[in-house]
Amino acid sequence: MTMITFLTTTQNGSYDRLATRQAVFLKQNLNVDSQIIRMAQTQLVPVKGSHVIIYTTFNIYPVLINKYRQQLEGKKCVALLDSALMTIPYRNPVFKDPICTVYTTSRFNQENFATLGVSIPYIPHFIPDPNPEGKLKSLSERQYDFITVGINEMDFDRKGHFWNFLVQRWGFKAISVCKFYCFGDHKQDLPDEELWSLYANTKWYLGTSHAETPHLPLLEAYAFGTPAVYISAHEFRYIGFGIPISPAYINVKGTKNFYFAEINTESFIQAVGKAMRMSEGDYNSLSKQARRFFENNYSLNNRVDEFRALFDDSM
């Protein structure tokens, strides 16, 4: 029987949470067993799978390959990489090393690689559908106006929860799911089922991340027909679906040197106002489009053959 090993470099972050969901899906639908190694950059764990998927950043990938190279020899290995940092080692030959086939799940990253003379193929994330029945609530059935989800870096509010706090102060019913930087009404460490319930019961995903590559919470919100009010910068420029906010400026910020986009306050006010003035009929139509956007681009349920093709259908 085929076994997949997921090498991830997070602990309760987007990489290992996605791997966990994929592992459940693969077992239920393909009878494929999985091994998930979290924080793999900090430890050397025996790789049991004949097939390997690596979830990490372009920055950490060279370190991970160095550590696990011997264990990856002879295995079918695919790396699905992204990074919101400006310190990506774009020209590092390890990204072309045959030990593992490298893809990026970020069109923002792909564009920057191409600009600097390196071709990296793009493939969207394979996300098990958290709403497989496709049930969508209408505008009037949704309890919250806005939701923002994200665990932040320690040195600044990278996920932009402050903007969620602002709409709370303005009188809207909004909620944040956060970790280190939390403002106003918020929740922490939610199980998936509660998080998905929040998506289903919220009108708009407030996508105000200052630095981002494929944002799992935003994409999962689309599965529940929840469109976005989002900053049109970094990866959100490609995956945002709904009402865009203009950036005020783009810079580098944080101890890790993040690509940083600040929000234009006037554009933010206009976008929030447009969202809250939208009619029931127009919203419900947009909600259905958001759901289709997820189904057509990200749903693993609809892309099993494409997933298997990563390994030349040997899985």
UniProtKB/Swiss-Prot annotation:
InterPro entries: YkvP/CgeB_Glyco_trans-like
Domain of life: Viruses
Pfam family of the protein (one): Glyco_trans_1_2
Entry keyword annotation includes DNA damage: no
Gene3D superfamilies in the record: Glycogen Phosphorylase B
Any one Gene Ontology molecular-function term assigned to this protein's record: glycosyltransferase activity
The enzyme's E.C. designation: 2.4.-.-
Keyword terms: Glycosyltransferase, Transferase
Family: Belongs to the glycosyltransferase group 1 family. Glycosyltransferase 4 subfamily.
Name of the protein this chain belongs to: Putative glycosyltransferase ORF315
Organism encoding this protein: Acidianus bottle-shaped virus (isolate Italy/Pozzuoli)
